[in-house]
A protein has these predicted regions:
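N-terminal glycine-/serine-/threonine-rich phosphate-binding loop
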Residues: 2-38, 43-61
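Short acidic, glycine/serine/threonine-rich loops at helix termini
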Residues: 26-28, 49-53, 60, 66-70, ...
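Short amphipathic alpha-helical segments, especially helix-boundary/capping motifs
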Residues: 2-5, 18-23, 70, 113-117, ...
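Short, basic, glycine/proline-bearing loop/turn elements
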Residues: 10-14, 77-84, 123-124
Length: 178
């Protein structure tokens, strides 16, 4: 059985796709301290850069533009392979290397506020466009690979994450990831 130290997971690369950007600076400050590379989508990327932090836009990272009026932004194998790869699996490591993909260790996503929009409009088109596809898919991928990937879905989780991340010197504990 692996010891506690073996169960911590160093975070080197993160993807952020946030509707609620209210506490983003708290996360960015911590990620910068530990030299975590950040990938982010459109509005999140703009906010990160506005705050003076570095990031790479999803479209630049995947070398694939957003398509279908923004309906397809984060649905790309380079992201999902990086999130889902089993770090201890030699074949997975080889496939990542062969495809020039990196492991993604941290997924921070807030979903579109569908319920809020539903309360404020009955406009069918607006409702349909606020059904989040990419966000939940990123979260499900990270949850499936919790042994290697940390996932946050609410700014309410940031302080607890930072506490665990700092305690483990740039890693997260298996207990936190569960």
């Amino acid at each position: 059985m692996a010891n506690k130290q073996d169960m911590s997971k160093k975070i080197k690369k993160a993807i952020l796709s946030l509707t609620d950007k209210s506490e983003i600076k708290l996360i960015l400050k911590t990620l910068k301290k530990y030299k975590v590379d950040v990938i982010s989508s459109g509005g999140t990327s703009k906010e990160i850069k506005k705050l003076g932090y570095k990031c790479i836009e999803v479209s630049d990272y995947t070398n694939s533009d957003e398509i279908l009026d923004g309906r397809v932004k984060t649905l790309h194998p380079k992201l999902y392979a990086g999130i889902l790869s089993k770090r201890e699996n030699k074949k997975h490591k080889e496939e990542l290397k062969k495809n020039d993909y990196d492991e993604i260790d941290l997924v921070i996503v807030n979903f579109y506020p569908f319920e809020k929009i539903l309360k404020n409009t009955k406009n069918h088109i607006k409702l349909i466009e606020n059904i989040d596809i990419g966000g939940p898919t990123l979260v499900r991928a990270a949850a499936k690979n919790y042994k290697s990937t940390t996932v946050l879905t609410s700014s309410n989780q940031y302080k607890e994450f930072i506490k665990d991340f700092e305690k483990n010197k740039g890693s997260t504990s298996l207990e936190f990831r569960k």
